[in-house]
C-alpha cells in the first residue's frame, strides 16, 4: 500500500522553483479602474440586513484600510469575507457616496 504522505524531498526539478499562486500578493488597482458593486442582502443572516461591497481589487492591507474607513464613515460594524466588504445595516447610499468621493466607479446593484 502506498504512503499517503507527500515525498519529503524533490527528486527532479526543472526551471527552478515554482511560485505558489496562492501566495502572490494582489496588486492594488487605482480606484478609477475598479468596478465596484454595492448591494444590501439578508440571505443567510437570520433576517439581518448587511451591505456587501464586491468587485474590489485590492491587497489584503488595502481591503483592511477601506473596511476601517467605511466602518468609521457609516458608524457601524463590518467584516471582510471572501474578498467582499460587509457592513452591518442598509448603508448603500452612504457607501456609494463615500466610494464615489474617493474616485471609485461604484454602482448599486440588486433590489
Curated annotation (Swiss-Prot):
One of its GO terms (molecular function) is translation initiation factor activity. InterPro entries: DENR/SUI1_TIF, SUI1, SUI1_arc_bac, SUI1_dom_sf. The keyword Kinase does not apply. Signal peptide: none annotated. PROSITE patterns: SUI1 (PS50296). One of its GO terms (biological process) is formation of translation preinitiation complex. Gene3D superfamilies: SUI1-like domain. Keywords: Protein biosynthesis, Translation regulation. CDD domains: YciH_like. Belongs to the SUI1 family. This is Uncharacterized protein sll0546.
Amino acid at each position: 500500500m502506498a504512503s499517503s504522505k507527500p515525498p519529503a524531498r524533490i527528486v527532479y526539478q526543472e526551471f527552478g522553483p515554482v511560485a505558489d499562486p496562492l501566495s502572490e500578493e494582489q496588486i492594488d488597482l487605482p480606484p478609477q479602474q475598479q468596478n465596484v458593486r454595492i448591494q444590501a442582502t439578508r440571505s443567510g443572516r437570520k433576517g439581518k440586513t448587511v451591505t456587501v461591497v464586491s468587485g474590489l481589487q485590492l491587497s489584503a492591507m488595502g481591503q483592511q484600510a477601506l473596511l476601517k474607513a467605511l466602518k468609521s464613515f457609516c458608524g457601524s460594524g463590518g467584516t471582510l469575507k471572501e474578498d467582499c466588504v460587509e457592513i452591518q445595516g442598509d448603508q448603500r447610499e452612504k457607501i456609494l457616496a463615500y466610494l464615489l468621493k474617493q474616485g471609485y466607479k461604484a454602482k448599486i446593484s440588486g433590489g
